[in-house]
Amino acid sequence: MPAPLFLSGSCEVCGDKTSGRHFGVMSCRACAAFFRRAATWNLEKRICPNGTCHTSVNGKFNCKQCRLKKCLDVGMDTRRFQTDRDLISCSAISQSLATFLGRPEFILCCEPDRASVLKTTIDVTRLVNIARDMLQKPTNHVLPSNSLEQLATTLDNMRCVESNKEVKFIEKYGKVETLKSWEQGFLRVVEWFSNFSEFRELNERLKLEIVKSCWFSWTRLDKLSETANKQINKMLGKSQLMVGNGACMNMNNFEIDLSWCTNYSLEQLKYFFQTPNGKKNFQQSIQDMIDLNPSSIEVSYMLLHLSLEHAGKRLHGDALDATENLVQVQANNLHKYYVEKLKLANYSSRLTQLMRITRTLEADIRIRIEKKQIADVFNIMKIDFSHPEMFEAT
């Protein structure tokens, strides 16, 4: 193997230390860069205005024209310029399917002939009437010391009833499974709120509006919590998720049928049904719930905080005032639970971790609502609802 070539010496143009051979001449980087810029000058610009200049004491030229002349005299050659290299940055937009078709990604697969102008209306008036009756009926349960414990007891009772039933594994999620899950989830939320003493003091219109607005966010967190509990007790595997009352799915092995609600395929609707990092965030939230293993009191506060915060932001006005007051009352009850019952003087770290889970779900739901609005603009779905405010995040 030949010995390495060491290029040393002085620059043939200015006499400074050389950095190698540039354009056929041993020169420094400064003179090489200068020649690369100045070689394209026209003849008039190359003429020295003073006649002939000399280099200064430190080897620098006072005249650019004479410096260029010296570069040419020592043999620098413009034919050695390399002009066929790749650009460091390209001004052209990289070609993609979206740029090729000239359509945004979120309507990339939107085929106008599949859009549904005429829609089938799903009437949920019966569900709303059932909810109204449930919220008006008096509770017969013995009330605990405060409403947060009351909600925790209600949640435990609902889950106790389901624990006696065999878990059903769903392999295909279609129209029947979806509508059943929605109905069960909505009525479950109504039952829970009907045992909330401060909530029952609100007027009938306000109670119904809040429940209709927040039931989906409540259900999402409830199923996440229930999944974590069953995984802790070794009743479900890591890839299995609760999706309804006593029903679960294997997230790695299931089929979704959307033919009943849209003319588009699941592949075409990935943008609308999948949020960025949605699956990853949901799995991480389940793991966080497993690690924290919150009590029924803590889970009830999380459910209340997430659902009422969502309802207040969507409804505004007197609903916002009511939800803020309800959350504040339960925050005080949670403080008493930590300090008086658990004897925790400093619980801020644990509460922060619990609230991080609700914020993750809240962000996911917000994205779902925005995508649902886009889908409505382009008539992606072929179904509508008698009470559309209930299904803005589905």
From Swiss-Prot:
- InterPro entries cross-referenced by the UniProt entry: C.elegans_Orphan_NR, NHR-like_dom_sf, Nucl_hrmn_rcpt_lig-bd, Znf_hrmn_rcpt, Znf_NHR/GATA
GO cellular component terms attached to this protein's record: nucleus
Instruction: Tell me which UniProt keywords the record has, alphabetically.
Output: DNA-binding, Metal-binding, Nucleus, Receptor, Transcription, Transcription regulation, Zinc, Zinc-finger
Q: Where does this protein bind DNA? A: 8-83
- Residues in domain NR LBD? 134-394
Please state where this protein is localized.
Nucleus
Principal cellular location given in the protein's record: nucleus
Q: Describe, by residue range, where the zinc fingers (NR C4-type) fall in the chain.
A: 11-31, 48-71
- GO MF annotations in UniProt: DNA-binding transcription factor activity; sequence-specific DNA binding; zinc ion binding
Coiled-coil regions listed: none
Q: What does this protein do?
A: Orphan nuclear receptor.
Give the family from UniProt: Belongs to the nuclear hormone receptor family.
Q: What is the protein's name according to its record?
A: Nuclear hormone receptor family member nhr-18
- Organism source for this protein? Caenorhabditis elegans
Lineage here is: Eukaryota, Metazoa, Ecdysozoa, Nematoda, Chromadorea
